[in-house]
């Protein structure tokens, strides 16, 4: 037995056949070759060691919950401080606002205004 064969048959630790017993990486599935070789470290395992091993997978889909419709009064678009700004749609004086950092950090924030009367929304880059 050569030194290379000895290195490939001695493992660093004991593990399940799904993992390389030398480096711990996930092993590829056995193919037509006589050995399964770890892609990361090159450790070899005889393909006969996998005889009788059953691989079972399952996919579980969880049902999505139904979203509760938001009432106009509860919506996030109505939250925030109110400023003296005239709504371009209904002419009402007073719009709620909130800010978000939509662009890169060295750019200004984006201010979102919402009319407290008709819920019209507009944005302004500052």
UniProtKB/Swiss-Prot annotation:
Gene behind the chain: POLR1H
ZnF TFIIS-type: positions: 83-123
Zinc finger (C4-type): 20-41
GO molecular function, one term: DNA-directed RNA polymerase activity
Pfam families membership: Zn_ribbon_TFIIS
Record function comment: Core component of RNA polymerase I (Pol I), a DNA-dependent RNA polymerase which synthesizes ribosomal RNA precursors using the four ribonucleoside triphosphates as substrates. Can mediate Pol I proofreading of the nascent RNA transcript. Anchors into the Pol I active site to monitor transcription fidelity and cleave mis-incorporated 5'-ribonucleotides.
The protein's name in its UniProt record: DNA-directed RNA polymerase I subunit RPA12
Domain notes: The TFIIS-type zinc-binding beta-ribbon domain contains an acidic hairpin motif (residues Asp-106, Glu-107) that likely coordinates the nucleophilic water and magnesium to cleave the scissile phosphodiester bond and release the mis-incorporated 5'-ribonucleotides.
SMART domains, sorted: ZnF_C2C2 (SM00440)
The keyword Nucleus appears for this protein: yes
Similarity comment: Belongs to the archaeal RpoM/eukaryotic RPA12/RPB9/RPC11 RNA polymerase family.
Alphabetical keyword list: DNA-directed RNA polymerase, Metal-binding, Nucleus, Transcription, Zinc, Zinc-finger
Binding positions for Zn(2+) 2 per the UniProt entry: 87, 90, 115, 118
InterPro entries: DNA-dir_RNA_pol-M_15_CS (IPR019761), Rpa12/Rpb9/Rpc10/TFS (IPR012164), Zn_ribbon_RPA12_C (IPR034004), Znf_TFIIS (IPR001222)
Example GO BP: termination of RNA polymerase I transcription
Gene3D superfamilies given in the database record: 2.20.25.10
